[in-house]
Amino acid sequence: MKYPKSGNYRSAIVMKDLDFDGTDEAIAFYRTASENKAEVHMLVMYCANGGWKLSENCTIDATDVDCVDFADVTGNGTLEILSGYTTYNSSVNNLACHSYSGGKTTGLTVESSYSSFYCADFDGNGINEVMLLSLYNTENDATANMLVYSEERNCLYSKSTVKMDPNITRFKNLSVTATENSQNALIVDGCFANDDTVTQIIYFNNELSVLRNPLFKEKDKNITQRSADVLCADINNDSVIEIPVVNQLPSASDEDKSNVAYKTSWNTFYQQSEILNHISDQIIDYDNGYSFTVPEGWIDGTYTVRFDKEKQAMCFFEWYDGTLGEKLFEIRAFKLEQWDIGEDSDAYTLIYKSDSTAYAFADVNEDNNLSVSEDDIKTAFSLLTVNNI
């Protein structure tokens, strides 16, 4: 049996109702030990008269299965099987597409390789397209390539291609979000060889009938490039993906920068003008699993934050005329047993207590232009979850 190496379906046998008749079909991948050449078999099976029937045994020239996904790319109301297969080049895979209906499986012609792919309705016509993403190598440029279905030719062909950052060495996360006109855009988090993360946004411009990648400029640094390992996410549960822009807060030139916190500015993508629209700012403590949302009244350059790693604390300060000003407050993470016995915690007010950690604040400065109330501190505190980091 062969197990897909990536994607949402990792089983060698995948169950999926391809024709929406209420009964799952089965898709199985295998390679026999006796085969001398590199071939992977994909079996498509359906249930009839109380037993399983073979619809098709598809043979693909490959050694392994990269991934499998399902989408209605033909617009006929059934799900096509999109399966990817590895090649001798670890960053290049080959795509195959098969359509199932009434017990019969037929192949669609696809002549495109990829590094990662994603299926969604990118042009708003109600039918899924296939977005192929390719990393740069000696054989291919770094591109995004949108495939659409041609009924006349029974194939998936390239409708539009756009350049991507050739310095990306791998893709970390792909997600789709709706823009202000409800059209889907593909959010692509990738990383460089030095492990910096960068975001690119791929969308189809219906007026020009072209793919666009507005955050990538060949001669300019992408504003989303960041050393912090933070990915695009829906931070406020509004079903829209936010894009982070990360910058270190102010510090003195001779200061230890490892203790200086970063500000993460969260933005949505505004398609009409191809800009990032600012939503909110956060200071994130990854080690202790929480974030603090910066008050709207705080202006950039007037505040800064330091990590006290010995105390497991995040300390907020005024930043005035290039120097560290008054302390505003601090948030500290206590081990639960430490908090429960009152060890070094008398001056602290509890924000939240989990199974292992108590989060609390202290040293609230009430006489500063940047002062915030205790209730505001509690409201701005948030635990990190899968959806909001």
Task: Give the positions of each predicted feature.
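Beta-propeller-forming repeat regions
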Residues: 1-307, 313-315, 339-360, 379-389
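Domain-scale activation on soluble regions of proteins
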Residues: 355-371
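A short acidic-to-branched-hydrophobic micro-motif
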Residues: 318-338
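Secondary-structure transition/turn motif
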Residues: 191, 317-323, 363-368
